[in-house]
């Protein structure tokens, strides 16, 4: 299968004089439909790498390739926004759902942002809510949902625009183990059906084993885990 996402020689340094390396020369290619788990101890740079991958943070050096479109630290904010909206999906440990919106409105939002009509956005949102088993709760507020249900809303929102890749930063970290596997299975099933790649940062080693392959950040370096 073709490569839909790649990091090439990505480095990130912090400090006044860039004296603190967080990531050094990270390279990875992710194919269409592939699930790649990213592991590493707390503070190793997993979230930083995913933020760079999602064009939410700028690398000190290196390039990101999304659908063969090159993106560097010189890429304009306008172009980054376009790439995020049309090619990327995001899921976080803390769902970042809009509390004042209903379940349906939260899931519709990415479609509205890219210019879909409300009627089409609503139709697509209801279809994907059915896939994550929340179609009966579309009118509820986020505060009325359980933690697992909120993450299912976050998954639906991340997938509604059929991105090339979903970047998931500890998406099940706040859930109990059974709920975590249930939520991940929903994500995995839909992504497989639509051939969507997933780059998943997790502390859950059992969850990581369900990926196609595992990579690890250790001492600022990214390497494959056999």
Curated annotation (Swiss-Prot):
Family matches, as PROSITE patterns: ABC_TRANSPORTER_1, ABC_TRANSPORTER_2, LOLD
GO molecular function, a single term: ATP binding
Subunit-level organization: The complex is composed of two ATP-binding proteins (LolD) and two transmembrane proteins (LolC and LolE).
Domain called ABC transporter: residue spans: 5-225
Chief location category: membrane
Keywords for this protein: ATP-binding, Cell inner membrane, Cell membrane, Membrane, Nucleotide-binding, Translocase, Transport
GO cellular component terms given for this protein: plasma membrane
Organism: Ehrlichia canis (strain Jake)
Pfam families found in the cross-reference section: ABC_tran
Gene: lolD
Cited function: Part of the ABC transporter complex LolCDE involved in the translocation of mature outer membrane-directed lipoproteins, from the inner membrane to the periplasmic chaperone, LolA. Responsible for the formation of the LolA-lipoprotein complex in an ATP-dependent manner.
Membrane topology listed for this record: Peripheral membrane protein
Source organism, top-level taxon: Bacteria
Enzyme Commission number(s) from the entry: 7.6.2.-
Protein family according to the UniProt entry: Belongs to the ABC transporter superfamily. Lipoprotein translocase (TC 3.A.1.125) family.
InterPro entries (UniProt xref): AAA+_ATPase, ABC_transporter-like_ATP-bd, ABC_transporter-like_CS, MacB-like_ATP-bd, P-loop_NTPase
Ligand binding (ATP): 40-47
Name of the protein this chain belongs to: Lipoprotein-releasing system ATP-binding protein LolD
Subcellular location: Cell inner membrane
Family annotation (SMART domains): AAA
């Amino acid at each position: 299968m073709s490569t839909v996402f790649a990091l090439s020689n990505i480095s990130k340094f912090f400090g006044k004089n860039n004296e603190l390396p967080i990531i050094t020369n990270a390279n990875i290619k992710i194919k269409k439909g592939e699930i790649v788990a990213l592991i590493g101890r707390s503070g190793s740079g997993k979230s930083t790498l995913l933020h760079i991958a999602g064009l939410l943070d700028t690398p000190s050096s290196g390039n990101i390739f999304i659908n063969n479109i090159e993106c560097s630290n010189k890429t304009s904010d306008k172009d980054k926004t376009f790439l995020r909206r049309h090619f990327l999906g995001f899921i976080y440990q803390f769902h970042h759902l809009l509390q004042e919106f209903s379940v349906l409105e939260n899931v519709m939002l990415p479609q509205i942002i890219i210019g879909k009509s409300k009627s089409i956005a609503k139709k697509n949102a209801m279809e994907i809510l059915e896939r994550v088993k929340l179609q009966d709760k579309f009118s509820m507020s986020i505060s009325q949902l359980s933690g697992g249900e909120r993450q299912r809303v976050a998954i639906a929102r991340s997938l509604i625009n059929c991105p090339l890749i979903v970047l998931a930063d500890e998406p099940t970290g706040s859930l109990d183990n059974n709920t975590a596997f249930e939520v991940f299975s929903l994500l995995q099933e839909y992504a497989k059906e639509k051939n969507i790649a997933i780059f998943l940062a997790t502390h859950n080693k059992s969850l990581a084993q369900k990926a196609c392959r595992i990579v690890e950040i250790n001492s600022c370096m990214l390497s494959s885990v056999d």
